[in-house]
Amino acid sequence: MSLTRLLIKDFRNIENADLALSPGFNFLVGANGSGKTSVLEAIYTLGHGRAFRSLQPGRVIRHEQEAFVLHGRLQGEEREMSIGLTKDKQGDSKVRIDGTDGHKIAELAHLMPMQLITPEGFTLLNGGPKYRRAFLDWGCFHNEAGFFTAWSNLKRLLKQRNAALRQVSRYEQLRPWDKELIPLAEQISTWRAEYSSAIAQDMADTCQQFLPEFSLTFSFQRGWEKETDYADVLERSFERDRMLTYTAHGPHKADFRIRADGAPVEDTLSRGQLKLLMCALRLAQGEFLTRESGRRCLYLIDDFASELDDARRGLLASRLKATQSQVFVSAISAEHVIDMSDENSKMFTVEKGKITD
């Protein structure tokens, strides 16, 4: 899938925009604060239901407006479809696909698999485990049809179990929740383990190309002890969980550890090297999806030139072109991206929320 057209209304500093897009590279050039990142964020929001710079919908709605509206035309192999998202200040969303309402945001996410590379994206490597769980869960969501339902049910049951921990005095009182929770936890952990194993070679190969000076290793940790039954862990941990008033073990505590030469990457790599690693991981994940399903990602890259020298920018550009995917790149100057441009790409200039090509 690729976006052929994007309409933006009352999103951040953009009052109205109607963009005809290239199926290849689309460049957004403008000064800081011009609105170029807002275009990337609008695309991301259309596919995720939320912005990547703010979780509060009111902050991305243009000043003194009640809602934002995003609309896109998606070109697939066989046909084109329309998608739309409206969200108001209260956070209420309306999703429309091919002219019909009542759809879920998860449907948009499935239609528009995206990889996001931003200056804030270092959290994948130096942030908490939740960011690396999200990396694995993106892959599971796009590779396992039942993942989203299982993951949603797991979140619901954990919330209910944690609330119950404040009220119960004996473990037997928790069994109704654990009876449902245990098979879900084991299934999600199995999916994550299988995905991390399947993509490991792709990640290793891509990382070797981007960071040949390091030996990188990847390890999945499921959130409770190896070779231990989750049911036993929950029962054994009851008193501690009750004291903490939350469930201390499970797939919600999983991690995906990345090491360079045996040490955590956040302690070993420079900022430039961390950005290269982040790019390599996102590329590997997108390429794995294409190979396994035939579907291509949209790549969103904010502030392309930051942290990368000319050689590394050239390497990233060549790898992105090889994916034959649709790519959106923001930059302060056209000079930073002109070498990536070809006859099929489009260059947009962004100034004070106005976009021209």
From Swiss-Prot:
**Where can this protein be found?**
Cytoplasm
UniProt entry tagged with the keyword DNA-binding: yes
Q: Name one GO molecular function term.
A: single-stranded DNA binding
GO BP term, example: DNA synthesis involved in DNA repair
Q: Which InterPro entries match?
A: DNA-binding_RecF, DNA-binding_RecF_CS, P-loop_NTPase, RecF/RecN/SMC_N, RecF_2
UniProt xrefs under Pfam families:
SMC_N
Residue positions binding ATP: G30, A31, N32, G33, S34, G35, K36, T37
What broad class describes the main subcellular location of this protein? cytoplasm
**Domain of life of the source:** Bacteria
Give the family per the record: Belongs to the RecF family.
Function per UniProt = The RecF protein is involved in DNA metabolism; it is required for DNA replication and normal SOS inducibility. RecF binds preferentially to single-stranded, linear DNA. It also seems to bind ATP.
Name-wise, this protein is: DNA replication and repair protein RecF
Q: What organism does this protein naturally occur in?
A: Salmonella paratyphi A (strain AKU_12601)
Whichever gene encodes this chain, its name is recF
